[in-house]
């Protein structure tokens, strides 16, 4: 198995990946479905239902967290399932998740202009035609296509640009949500809660009502899986990536629960019934009642529109990276692995998915509802396969470094498989309430046939290269397993070492390097004194992040300065020596007049 240096730029911060995951999960549902949730389970019953659903997804999220930190490569599910199940399992898993992403992107393109009609009823102008009972208007079509083009353009311009857009919109969503919650506390009344805390007139019917909410909630948490798709672009310690993924799920559960409580506190059962019979936007009407102003309902709808765009943006990021990873493994045409020369984004994959989102509104909203339901089925199938991969890899690769290592993996893995398998079953079993209708099965079947065609054609075209996988090298320190000593522990051990230090003589060697390299052992704080015999200007060589974040680099640099030795930094070392450009470092040393090298870390 080969290794290569990542072609992506590491531009995503911890905040970026948090808002990408959270924004993907918080779409339009909290605006349009809250009344239905309360009607099914009652206010507190719906909150408990979301908590149960969150726990179901939480176990799946734990498997993702461990695998993403262990294999931080573009494609996420593609890499996990490849290592566990081989190329065929990887193809099925990744192709399924791509269906989920593409369908969501296309659906959001239609959802946005539809919501504008709630704010401006006269928005629809220029009737064109009708598809499956849905009327297509020129104004509706124009807005959908223009926004689809804009979001695709933003993503092509760079991952960081897309993350910035995500941050702005997520802050707006959070702000609107906080306004509703605070206003409901001020303007609401506990008497509104009393008659609608729970649905059902007995313990058994109440529990059944709560579970009716719980079984539908996992579908509102789809989106946290976007994080592993862009793992190569994340500039965050690997262990923290897993933590952020879990945090995003917790925040989504909390957001939904607080919105339900806010609506229930300010709206009586009769208010909710009237709202559902009218606009159907119970949350927006709750906002208007809390502020005693109809304008505030439109403010909340704007927040819902931001939720549509954050989901859209996140799934476009995820879908394009998943396609890139399949093309990288010769499973689909190689053209989809092309990166933009300047922005380092998978440009051809973005062109395709973005193009589909621009064309999607032509087919109307009803047809895209069928597609997105089929896509959700694909996401749940991928979740189940990733959960299985988690268990398989604990047996198959126990020695794999796992920066974020889940405890009690057997329990977590089995529960994750059961939970995700349950979600898949809900789409398959007739009468479950979420089962696919014939049109949706046709969509899923068509996607499966397209996948089979790609599989056969690429297998014949690329032959033995089909399904090949290339690992991406990462920094040594970043992949340290949980059981290993931490970098800080190692540094402490060095600082408390014996005072007697053996300095080994310099070793000269020929590697086309115009400098001498000295290897020596000693305490960090004595680096300057140890370096004195070998030169007057040092090149400090280290990896990308760990030495600087731990403070080791600062200690070495200060020691050199105290000893009167100038120094410059070369921090482009990767884990795999074959991917580290030695000549680049040598040229840098020569250009800066360095006559000694101080290397920090094993990779250096």
Regions found by a protein language model. Give the residues of each.
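Helix-loop-helix junctions that connect adjacent transmembrane segments
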Residues: 3-8, 47, 123-139, 168-298
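Terminal cytosolic tails of multi-pass membrane transporters
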Residues: 1-12, 390-411, 431-500
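Extracellular loop-to-transmembrane helix junctions
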Residues: 9, 33-134, 248-251, 443-449
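Membrane-interface loop-to-helix entry segments
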Residues: 139-190, 245-250, 372-385, 411-415, ...
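N-terminal small/polar loop signature for handling phosphorylated ligands or for N-terminal nucleophile
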Residues: 551-604
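TM-loop-TM module centered on a large, flexible mid-protein loop between adjacent transmembrane helices
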Residues: 79-81, 86, 118-123, 129, ...
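Membrane-helix boundary/coupling elements in multi-pass transport proteins
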Residues: 64, 73, 96-114, 221, ...
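Transmembrane helix-loop boundary segments of multi-pass membrane transporters
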Residues: 36-42, 46, 110-111, 124-136, ...
């Amino acid at each position: 198995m080969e290794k290569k240096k990542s072609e992506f730029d590491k531009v995503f911060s911890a905040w970026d990946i948090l808002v990408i995951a959270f924004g993907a999960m918080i779409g339009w549902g909290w605006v349009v479905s809250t009344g239905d949730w309360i009607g099914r389970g009652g206010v507190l019953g719906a909150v408990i239902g979301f908590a149960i659903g969150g726990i179901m997804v939480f176990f799946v999220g734990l498997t993702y967290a461990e695998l993403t930190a262990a294999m931080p490569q573009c494609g996420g599910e593609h890499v996990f399932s490849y290592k566990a199940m081989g190329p065929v399992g990887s193809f099925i898993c990744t192709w399924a998740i791509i269906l989920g992403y593409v369908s969501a992107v296309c659906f959001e393109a239609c959802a946005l202009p539809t919501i504008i009609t709630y704010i401006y009823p006269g928005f629809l102008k220029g009737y064109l035609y009708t598809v499956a009972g849905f009327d297509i208007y020129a104004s509706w079509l124009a807005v959908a296509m223009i926004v689809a083009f804009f979001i695709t353009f933003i993503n092509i311009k760079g991952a960081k640009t897309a993350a910035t857009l995500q941050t702005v919109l997520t802050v707006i969503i959070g702000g609107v949500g906080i306004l509703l919650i605070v206003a409901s506390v001020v303007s609401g009344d506990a008497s509104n809660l009393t008659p609608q805390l729970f649905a059902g007139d007995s313990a058994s019917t109440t529990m059944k009502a709560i579970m009716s909410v719980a079984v539908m909630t996992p579908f509102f948490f789809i989106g946290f899986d976007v994080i592993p798709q862009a793992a190569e672009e994340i500039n965050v310690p690997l262990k923290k990536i897993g933590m952020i993924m879990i945090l995003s799920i917790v925040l989504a559960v909390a957001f939904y629960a607080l919105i339900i409580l806010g609506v229930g506190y300010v709206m009586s059962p009769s208010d909710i019934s009237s709202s559902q019979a009218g606009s159907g936007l119970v949350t927006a009407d709750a906002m208007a009642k809390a502020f005693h102003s109809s304008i505030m309902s439109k403010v909340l709808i704007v927040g819902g529109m931001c939720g549509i765009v954050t989901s859209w943006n996140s799934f476009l990021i995820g879908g394009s990276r998943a396609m890139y990873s399949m093309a990288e493994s010769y499973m689909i045409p190689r053209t989809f692995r092309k990166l933009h020369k300047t922005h380092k984004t998978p440009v051809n994959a973005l062109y395709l998915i973005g193009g589909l989102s621009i064309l999607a509104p032509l087919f109307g909203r009803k047809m895209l509802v069928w597609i997105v339901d089929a896509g959700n089925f694909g996401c749940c199938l991928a979740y189940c396969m990733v959960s299985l991969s988690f268990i398989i890899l604990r047996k198959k690769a126990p020695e794999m470094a796992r920066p974020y290592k889940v405890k009690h993996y057997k329990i977590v893995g089995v529960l994750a498989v059961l939970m995700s398998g349950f979600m898949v079953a809900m789409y398959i079993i007739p009468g479950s309430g979420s089962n696919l209708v014939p049109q949706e099965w046709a969509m899923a079947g068509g996607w499966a046939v397209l996948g089979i065609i790609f599989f056969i054609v690429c297998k014949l075209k690329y032959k033995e290269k089909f399904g090949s996988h290339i690992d991406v090298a990462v920094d040594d320190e970043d992949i340290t397993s949980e059981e290993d000593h931490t970098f800080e522990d190692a540094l402490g051990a060095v600082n408390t070492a014996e005072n007697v230090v053996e300095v080994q003589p310099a070793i000269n060697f020929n590697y086309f390097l115009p400098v001498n390299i000295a290897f020596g052992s000693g305490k960090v704080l004595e680096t300057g004194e140890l370096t004195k015999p070998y030169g007057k200007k040092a090149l400090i060589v280290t990896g990308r992040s760990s030495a600087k974040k731990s403070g080791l680099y600062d200690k070495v640099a200060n020691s050199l300065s105290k000893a009167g030795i100038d120094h410059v930094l070369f921090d482009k070392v990767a884990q795999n020596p074959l991917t580290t450009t030695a000549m680049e470092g040598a040229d840098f040393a020569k250009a800066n007049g360095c006559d000694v090298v101080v290397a920090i870390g094993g990779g250096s």
